[in-house]
């Protein structure tokens, strides 16, 4: 492949998983122009349906879309993300109801992880103290690092930060599936096929993702 283009999308919390593959792909195929966007899950699905993207990396849609195909990559449990010095950091597991007395910083409504939480645990979410809502996952993790707020995020999004801890939830139905989505029946460009293969290989070599896939 000497020339061509590739249009990739990812939700904010998973875009970092594309970095290594983007570097390797661009070095190997310098003539391929890559456009990458980080958006909310809802916006990515809209862009796929409008043929504005070749594929998108995101967690499962709370609402099934019969117009999209998916390639499953891995499952990740929703976890409570806290600073290592937070009282909750010493726990192995915790229930959502136990978080009522704590100040939470969460992705804003309309972002994929928040939609999943609201859809699966509507009654509990209404009673939690959500003090901050953000549309930037990087800032969200910076705020957790202050040890003032806690958050609920998929474990796979936890940054490589020795100051943060992920505490598993007691509730069932906490796993979320990360997948590549494309339009049903769409033709994969050669560039897209190669990138997807490289991404799958990169994720298979990612130690944290390996542990999630094998539930170790």
Task: Describe every region a protein language model picked out.
Residues 1-6, 97-101:
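Immediate post-signal peptide segment of exported/extracytoplasmic ligand-binding proteins
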Residues 3-29, 33-35, 42-45, 109, ...:
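N-terminal winged-helix
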Residues 20-24, 42-78, 82, 145-146, ...:
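Short beta-strand-centered segments that line the small-molecule binding cleft or hinge
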Residues 40, 44-52, 59, 112-167:
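Hydrophobic hinge/microswitch elements
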Residues 4-9, 56, 81, 105, ...:
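Short, well-ordered beta-strand segments
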Residues 17-18, 89, 102-124, 188-192, ...:
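Secondary-structure junction motif
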Residues 65-71, 75-76, 91, 98, ...:
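Beta-alpha-beta core module
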Residues 28-29, 141, 155-163, 172-216:
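C-terminal effector-binding regulatory domain of bacterial HTH transcription factors
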């Amino acid at each position: 492949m000497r020339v061509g283009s590739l249009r990739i999308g990812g939700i904010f919390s998973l875009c970092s998983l594309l970095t290594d593959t983007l570097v390797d792909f661009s070095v190997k195929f310098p003539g391929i122009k890559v456009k990458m966007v980080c958006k909310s899950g809802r916006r990515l699905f809209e862009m796929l349906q409008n043929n504005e993207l070749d594929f998108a990396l995101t967690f499962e849609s709370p609402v099934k879309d019969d117009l999209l195909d998916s390639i499953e990559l891995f499952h990740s449990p929703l976890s409570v993300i806290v600073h290592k010095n937070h009282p909750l950091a010493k726990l192995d597991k915790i229930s959502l109801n136990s978080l009522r007395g704590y100040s939470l910083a969460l992705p804003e409504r309309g972002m994929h992880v928040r939609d999943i939480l609201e859809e699966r645990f509507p009654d509990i979410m209404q009673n939690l103290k959500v003090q901050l809502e953000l549309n930037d996952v990087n800032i969200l993790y910076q705020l957790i690092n202050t040890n003032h707020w806690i958050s609920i995020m998929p474990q796979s999004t936890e940054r490589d930060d020795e100051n943060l801890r992920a505490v598993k939830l007691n509730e069932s139905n906490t796993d979320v599936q990360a997948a590549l989505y494309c339009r049903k029946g769409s033709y994969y460009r050669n560039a897209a096929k190669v990138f997807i293969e490289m991404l799958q290989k990169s994720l298979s070599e990612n130690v944290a993702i390996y542990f999630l896939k094998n539930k170790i």
